[in-house]
């Protein structure tokens, strides 16, 4: 059976708790919007909130994932390359690719990430 999580504010959804992203500096939050708890065995959809001036951890995973920038601007590291992106831009992160999302400017960064379950 499907699930609906209604958006309550710019970074809150009904029935979805914010989770600290311990590997990242500066108060980054994750929100699992769709996952195993919702009956989704093959993928998960998460929202990341990155405060202005902060970033996600520089990391790599075996799986690939897709990212949609929802708000703010970011410097995205993909392997040895860096790209500036903004709201509406889409990023593909290949499996085992070193990556990081850094909020630029005075506005927080918000993005949706779709990936296989951990």
Predicted features along the sequence, with ranges:
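A short, N-terminal "cap"/entry segment at the start of jelly-roll beta-barrel domains
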Residues: 1-42
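Conserved short histidine dyad/triad with adjacent acidic residue
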Residues: 30-32, 46-61, 95
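Short, surface-exposed secondary-structure edge patches
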Residues: 47, 66, 81-83
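A short hydrophobic beta-strand segment most commonly corresponding to one strand
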Residues: 47, 92, 106-118
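A generic "binding-loop/recognition-motif" signal
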Residues: 54, 62-63, 81, 97, ...
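Histidine-centered metal-chelating micro-motifs
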Residues: 54-57, 75, 91, 95-101
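Glycine- and acidic-residue-biased ligand/ion/polar-headgroup-sensing regions
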Residues: 63-74
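Short acidic-glycine-tyrosine-enriched beta hairpin
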Residues: 81-95
């Amino acid at each position: 059976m499907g699930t609906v999580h209604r958006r309550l504010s710019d970074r809150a959804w009904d029935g979805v708790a914010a989770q600290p992203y311990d590997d990242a500096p500066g108060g980054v939050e994750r929100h699992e919007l769709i996952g195993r708890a919702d009956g989704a065995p093959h993928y998960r959809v998460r929202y990341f909130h990155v405060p202005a001036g902060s970033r996600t951890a520089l990391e790599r995973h075996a799986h690939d994932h897709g990212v949609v920038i929802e708000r703010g601007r970011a410097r995205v590291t993909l392997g040895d390359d860096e790209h500036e992106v903004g709201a509406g831009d889409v990023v593909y992160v290949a499996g085992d690719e070193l990556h990081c999302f850094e909020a630029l400017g005075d506005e927080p960064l918000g993005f949706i990430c779709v990936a296989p379950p951990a």
